[in-house]
Amino acid sequence: MKSSNRNDIVLKASFGGQTRDIDGTRYSSSGGYATAISKQFILEKGVAVGVRYSSDFSKSEYAIAETIEELEQFRTSKYIQAEKGGIYQTIRNIKRKKILFIGLPCEVSALYNYWGRNTDNLYSISLVCHGPTTPKVQNLFASKLKENNNSQIKYFSVRYKESGWKPYYIYADFENGKHHQELFKGSSYEIAFQYLKRPSCSSCRYKLGDQEFGLVSDLTLGDFHAVEKNMLQYSPWGVSQASVQSEKGEYLIDLARRLCNVEFIPEKYITKYNYAFHHPVAQKTGRESFKRILLREGLDCAAKSLLVQIPTCYINAKRRIISFLYNVKSYLISK
């Protein structure tokens, strides 16, 4: 599937696995492929560009890592729109070095449109994208944590692994020694993430199968949600999914092999449980109402509003009914 601004992009093959270093997997969102590839890229005299939290954790922003130590700031998912801060201009001025850019598909596309056709030293990784939420969510959530704990944040993650890959937790360490932990699912942060995506994300064209735009990067990374315990790719601490889409992508997956388990994934598994790889995520009904409540009354009030609670009760009831009927069917078949 070709992209609109590159003529060398096609889905070649997909792989799954995780770093052979258990800590590398544990402190990454999935299997640690992005960090492993970036480490090897820097060791080969390149630089990596990715997203980090700001020093006060009120927002996320693009930055450049020239050392392996600087890569740590890119680790774990950021579910908010990242500030660009002139990053496209900055990396275009980098001379005589290879550059690895890691970002959302639309941001990768923007980089190539800005860069032009002379991209010999530019390598790209796009992340399977569900649509980021507004930076205000991070700002409000972080401010509330600081207020409740009477301290500044020194570490924050929305994909913390307590005892395994799933479920996801929000976790924060504070300078005064306190800690905060809560399930991401059902949190005010998660609810806002569902409701406050950019409107344009619901019609995103940077998806596998789109005939005009489609895939844009050398490699796409995400979670291998379809993995099962008996598969070679499986780890209880997380599994990355990597789709190679160009010759440069083949080079990047070869870098991953130096530090990671890399096993082939049949294409049927790539699309089975990774809907956002090939379809945009639909906009939630009530987005504007949720936004008005958030701006007027705050994040917690918006998340607890009837706008959210009534549909949630309906969905939960529907799931219980489906589960009950499935169990009845299984019982009758076994008789």
What are these regions (language model features)?
Residues 1-103, 255-335:
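Iron-sulfur-cluster electron-transfer modules
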Residues 28-36, 136, 199, 237, ...:
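Conserved active-site and cofactor/substrate-binding residues in soluble primary-metabolism enzymes
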Residues 44-47, 151-335:
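Long, compositionally biased charged/polar accessory segments in the mid-to-C-terminal portions
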Residues 48-52, 100-103, 124-126, 157, ...:
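A structural signal for short, well-ordered beta-strand segments and their strand-loop junctions
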Residues 60-61, 110-114, 134-139:
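A short acidic (Asp/Glu
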Residues 96-118:
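A glycine-rich beta-strand to alpha-helix segment
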Residues 112-123, 142-147:
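Short, surface-exposed basic-aromatic patches at helix termini and helix-loop junctions that form
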Residues 123-144:
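Short, flexible loop segments at boundaries between secondary-structure elements
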